[in-house]
UniProtKB/Swiss-Prot annotation:
Pathway: Porphyrin-containing compound metabolism; protoporphyrin-IX biosynthesis; 5-aminolevulinate from L-glutamyl-tRNA(Glu): step 2/2. This is Glutamate-1-semialdehyde 2,1-aminomutase. GO terms for biological process: protoporphyrinogen IX biosynthetic process. Belongs to the class-III pyridoxal-phosphate-dependent aminotransferase family. HemL subfamily. GO terms for molecular function: glutamate-1-semialdehyde 2,1-aminomutase activity; pyridoxal phosphate binding; transaminase activity. The keyword Isomerase applies.
Amino acid sequence: MNRNEILFDRAKAIIPGGVNSPVRAFGSVGGVPRFIKKAEGAYVWDENGTRYTDYVGSWGPAIVGHAHPEVVEAVREAALGGLSFGAPTEGEIAIAEQIAEIMPSVERLRLVSSGTEATMTAIRLARGFTGRDKIIKFEGCYHGHSDSLLVKAGSGLLTFGNPSSAGVPADFTKHTLVLEYNNIAQLEEAFAQSGDEIACVIVEPFVGNMNLVRPTEAFVKALRGLTEKHGAVLIYDEVMTGFRVALGGAQSLHGITPDLTTMGKVIGGGMPLAAFGGRKDIMECISPLAGVYQAGTLSGNPIAVAAGLKTLEIIQREGFYENLTALTQRLANGIAAAKAHGIEFAADSVGGMFGLYFAAHVPRNYADMARSNIDAFKRFFHGMLDRGIAFGPSAYEAGFVSAAHTPELIDETVAVAVEVFKAMAA
């Protein structure tokens, strides 16, 4: 009896779509989602008892591996002291200090419970600071599900965006301009036309939601230069990349100092925790110091903070990122080398994050990614899953390696990929 099928049917009878986040439903790959019963190290087990080598990593947070004993113990100790207080704690000061020490761009920081809250508030803060309404985002970049950011590109080069979700009024998105990622000419034209109306530019400094896409060095410099020139706020959305691609996030690799940074995933160690921070003069526009409002009952939850503090301690140990980066490169390069004749395939990685593309080349923007062979990805995904390897159930999602993976485990994964590619080419 397949417990996954039974649970999915049961879930669909009470939870819309049977899941609490759409990608989990396997809608883009077909089949029945795996209901996870437990996780440890580099593995997850479904309700049938089947073990999978996991490259989803809870979509990024599990950088030290699942159920790391030190993180679990930190959570246990914190829970014994109470689950939630709705009051300030020393732990939230400590984690803010830790993050600020690691990321010099963060002069002040506020904790929240989700990446969506972080980006939503960063946008509000940028608008409050500048007194402007318009924002720029890039096609294929995901910044959570707040109304002003659920926007797809308009029909013309520099038209303001249209809602990408039902239930979002057009008036909410009329101030959002959607441009092509890595397109400097569009960015320059947008500022030439509307520079004194643009409050901020929000960007994934390495994109993870149209698979892994790198920015060009020139694009990064243009982002910083144009926002500075026109008095707009540059927001680095490092919810995914923060502490994942490098200890100091993407901004440390780019040599860029953003005005605001949003972060999440890794900083909670697997618990619901996120943050936004940056320049003191911008951050001090927020309540209770000034008029930009933000609040949250569970913001700075002591259990999540305890998990985050222990995770931050672990990832700062000697050799952590060198090992993580080497493992991730070994995986990406190994799978790319394993591709069968006649199958277009490319791979890339940065830090502990990787992208697998059924395309001739690594994509540079959403249009490139949209031209990849989605049907081939579906076959690859299920071929790997049936053999005990779990990747994200969408061609548009990046993958993640943890410190719990080993070279031997990576090589086993590559060997399975060889089998799957051969089956696909047959």
